Amino acid sequence: MHCPFCAAVDTKVIDSRLVGDGSQVRRRRQCLVCNERFTTFEVAELVMPRVIKSDEVREPFNEDKLRRGMLKALEKRPVSSDDVENAINHIKSQLRATGEREVPTKLVGNLVMDALKKLDKVAYIRFASVYRSFEDIREFGEEIARLQD
């Protein structure tokens, strides 16, 4: 690590500690040339898989798109923003855990439906009706019946 004061390359770590939930490491460093001390934070770089759309087009995973879709389904429902963020983080973890470089949108959609089913049944039905392209009332009824089982 370069010293931010004198740009020397030689620095040593004096102290390391986990920060917050343990996903970050705080390090105190000292320059071996000018003896100045400074703090750095390290975070693991987690790469999300690319998404394969139904028309075979591949695009980067878009967390904002995921959030917008979930929030649209959850509109005017009694679900906290913390619960939504936790669900989004869980979905992202599940996608990374596949170990795949690319995942189909079907997998992402199913993970969203699983998360919504746990958060709010009405939001789940809203999302499922669009995601599965319900054509009539019968399909709504069948999905609601599956929820009640």
Swiss-Prot record:
Its cofactor is Zn(2+). GO terms for biological process: negative regulation of DNA-templated transcription. Residues 49-139 form the ATP-cone domain. GO terms for molecular function: ATP binding; DNA binding; zinc ion binding. It comes from the Bacteria. A zinc finger (unnamed) spans 3-34. Keywords: ATP-binding, DNA-binding, Metal-binding, Nucleotide-binding, Repressor, Transcription, Transcription regulation, Zinc, Zinc-finger. Pfam families: ATP-cone, Zn_ribbon_NrdR. Binds 1 zinc ion. Belongs to the NrdR family. Negatively regulates transcription of bacterial ribonucleotide reductase nrd genes and operons by binding to NrdR-boxes. This is Transcriptional repressor NrdR. The gene is nrdR.
